[in-house]
Amino acid sequence: MYRNVTQEIFMEQTKIILDENEMPKRWYNVLSDLPSPIDPPLDPRTWQPINPEALEPIFAKELIRQEMSSDRYIDIPAEILDVYRLWRPSPLFRAHQLEKDLKTPAKIYYKYEGVSPAGSHKTNTSIAQAYYNMKEGTERLTTETGAGQWGSALSLACNYFDLECKVYMVRSSYYQKPYRKSLMTLWGGNVVPSPSPDTEFGRKILKEQPDTPGSLGIAISEAVEDAIAHDNTKYTLGSVLNHVVLHQTVIGAECKKQLEQVEEYPDVVIGCCGGGSNLGGIGLEFIKDRLEGKHNARVVAVEPSACPSLTKGEYRYDFGDTAEMTPLLKMYTLGHKHIPPAIHAGGLRYHGDSPIISKLCAEGLMEAVSYGQKEVFDAAVQFARTEGIVPAPESSHAIRCAIDEALEAKQKGEEKVILFNLSGHGHFDMASYDKYFSGELE
């Protein structure tokens, strides 16, 4: 009997949408559930555990409290929820057309964070960080950005809460993605390529390495130096730190509810990983189930082979920035002086990783894999041509891994359920796609 595959596809649910009143009202803090605590950050002056008060010159007090908190859940303020409602809850899609193209028995689901105004998951934490700084009287925020997703998200958030915003954008991405700068400027952000002549450290790097592509470590140093130099200014970070990962857990909480609607639970959960926030955002809710003995989903971090901190780095204390101004964090690191190649996934060019993600990987609760950018773009193009969404190069790392998991399921004849985070769209990355189509990607 002839099987009409197309008809069967459209009989099944493709997108799973939650009502606004089903949006999570609190963030999940995995620190409360870990078998042992993560190692504390160290003061760069003494190399002893840092006193929280020592962080107050650069961070809002509430964000420091969240960074150190052992509370299992932290309520989301109503003012933040009001802004979240512009795009949350975000949709969960079943990738029917990709499944068909792969001829796999696996079911592939993806959470799409590109529906946020800034086009990525970064807005989940930028809104929170800008809000808490505004409440404490901060007038100006500084930050770094790699590919520009975080800088865009913070510029948007500062616009909402009437704050000035200075963004130090890694030089290679500043010139690769000029329209990201335009978007940040549209929302009131002041964007400069890093290293820049605006800071002492930037001038030092430019003198020593005038042709450097820059790095997130350098950009962080510049943003921290700027914040310390101005009394009305605080620094914000788009990934790595505990409170940033905390704010992203709305992603996984929504995923759980959405999968429950179709009576599914993932066998594997996948996220790209630079600093670790989007991976933590989608993965920690499922790690919680694993720690409680309820389920045993694998959680996989996917990083670029050009910057393989989890797969080839050392698990030790290291500075978060190049100038050694930040606290030292226990994490997987390639070394804070490391300058990665100028790959097109600029948001993943970070030498270290979240202490939370690092600990989970070290203890076998997460896995990590790496891919070269050519095979990542192969997957991105296949996804765009089947599912229609143009993915960001960073997010495409998760797609590559999801496709490989689906092909393995095909080989083994397994009906595996695969979930990945499509953390952002690639509308500002078309020059990178042009490089791919012209055969210029290394």
Curated annotation (Swiss-Prot):
Signal peptide region: none
GO molecular function list: L-serine hydro-lyase (adding indole, L-tryptophan-forming) activity; pyridoxal phosphate binding; tryptophan synthase activity
Keyword Acyltransferase: no
Pfam families noted in UniProt: PALP
InterPro entries: Trp_synth_b-like, Trp_synth_b_CS, Trp_synth_beta, Trp_synth_beta/beta-like, TrpB-like_PALP, TrpB-like_PALP_sf
Pathway it works in: Amino-acid biosynthesis; L-tryptophan biosynthesis; L-tryptophan from chorismate: step 5/5
Keywords: Amino-acid biosynthesis, Aromatic amino acid biosynthesis, Lyase, Pyridoxal phosphate, Tryptophan biosynthesis
Entry's EC annotation: 4.2.1.20
Cofactor(s) annotated in UniProt: pyridoxal 5'-phosphate
Family membership: Belongs to the TrpB family.
Subunit structure: Tetramer of two alpha and two beta chains.
Protein name: Tryptophan synthase beta chain 2
Organism of provenance: Methanosarcina mazei (strain ATCC BAA-159 / DSM 3647 / Goe1 / Go1 / JCM 11833 / OCM 88)
